[in-house]
């Protein structure tokens, strides 16, 4: 993946386009300055995009992978499943598990725990038969 050459001119055009697209994201101000109870750290999306643009101009990226990885990192920091970018180098590779996970409280009062769906289903069936 790191052997794919990087084209700075194309990257700059993409950033300009994506900047325009992200202007429609309604949570930018919230992400930049979230309330105290928000569980994720703040991220200034537009500033990070400008930083990536500066990296392109400064010649920081030596391959397409490192550029796309920075874009994807920005998007993941937004913690929004509605923000998805299918990019060229990273798109063919996905890492997934055939096992589903779920977060649930065992009694509705305790803090949620992470379970494999199959194990939780077995636990629920066993509990309901008791």
Regions found by a protein language model. Give the residues of each.
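Terminal targeting/pro-maturation regions of precursor/exported proteins
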Residues: 1-130
């Amino acid at each position: 993946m790191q052997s794919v050459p990087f084209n700075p001119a194309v990257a700059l055009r993409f950033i300009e386009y994506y900047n325009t697209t992200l202007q429609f994201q309604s949570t930018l101000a919230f992400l930049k300055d979230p309330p105290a109870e928000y569980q994720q750290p703040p991220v200034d999306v537009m500033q990070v995009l400008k930083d990536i643009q500066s990296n392109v101009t400064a010649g920081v990226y030596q391959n397409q992978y490192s550029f796309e990885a920075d874009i994807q990192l920005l998007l993941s920091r937004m913690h929004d499943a509605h923000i998805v970018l299918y990019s060229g180098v990273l798109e063919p590779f996905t890492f997934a598990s055939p096992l589903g996970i779920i977060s649930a409280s065992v009694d509705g009062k305790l803090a949620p725990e992470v379970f494999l769906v199959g194990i939780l289903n077995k636990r629920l069936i066993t509990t309901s038969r008791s």
